[in-house]
Amino acid sequence: MVGKAHHELLKEQHDIEIYDPALGYKHLKTPDAVIVCVSTPPRKDGACEMKNVFDVIETTPDVPILIKSTISVEGWDMLVDAFPNRMLNFSPEFLRAASAVEDLQNTDSILVGGSDPSFWGKVFNLPVEIAEVHELILAKYARNSFLALKVAFFNQMYDLCDALDVEYSAVAHYTTMDERIGDSHSFITEERGFGGHCFPKDINALVKTAQRNNVELSILKETVEYNRRIRKS
């Protein structure tokens, strides 16, 4: 999704070379820069698996690298330690799965942190807001975790409405009339809770990062457990 969206955005401005061994694209020729959009699946303990990102960087020439994959704070620190002389940058993506290409094409600026953010403004031909990488990583996780929390909250409101024989759709409508809340992620589906690729992975990775730093994200932990229960039922 992320790789395809960036390909569509940049193909008119640059010669794009795809590197994806799983799809048969096994060799990089002489790129001027590399954008990393590989998956970072959860490990068994919920932490972010960095192997795919490491594999790409290890096979990439010494050129500027922009990581668009979702990575953890500790994952970034591992990369910096492993590749101290490489031109590493990170830029979070906030694309929706159903409209990733359109979302990226409508972007009017990019957030970048790392060794040379201004370079990537020239690549994308967009203004760059420069930030510290850890801030960007946590912001990415915070957005998805908050939306997962919102899904769980409205699912619990649905349960309460059901128990009281109250029409949930009316309650949700009157609640989300408040512009501060909005109606996104308030619709209840037959599957219940949140699934997909990003929300479960990212909320668990954020909880794991917090645990490693002796911080208890109790609200998010309960969200994960509640979601697990209703997804099984």
Identify the meaning behind each predicted range:
Residues H27-L28, E102-Q105, S186-E191:
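Solvent-exposed alpha-helices and their adjacent loops that cap or buttress functional pockets
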Residues V34-I35:
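N-terminal Rossmann-like NAD(P) cofactor-binding module of classical short-chain dehydrogenase/reductase
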